[in-house]
Amino acid sequence: MAKHPEPARHEVPAVDEAALAAARTADKLLECARQRGSQRWAEFLAPVPDLLRDAGVGELRAVAMRARAAYGPRDSIRDALPAELTGPFLDDLDRLRKVLARELAER
């Protein structure tokens, strides 16, 4: 059974838009973590915005899952950074995951 080649991001505008929205929110969250001196979360978040901007369609699910791991039951980014940033980032990540799932289902 032949595997279909991965589409380029620009060929899947809904995925690209969702990933870019999450990247913009991640930038804000990263800046906030740095301003507050939250080294743990600044280090965790540092690669996330660029990964969300640059990862291929096939890699984005793993990037979103890794970023979503910041919302753990014991150690959560919500405990260190403001809800007005952590809430929208979680929403953006979930939206990206849904768009990716829809794209994969259609293939």
Residue ranges and their predicted role:
Residues 30-77:
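Amphipathic alpha-helical interaction modules
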Residues 68-107:
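Amphipathic alpha-helical binding modules
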Residues 1-46, 93-107:
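Short terminal alpha-helical segments
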Residues 4-6, 12, 48, 72, ...:
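Intrinsic-disorder/low-complexity coil detector
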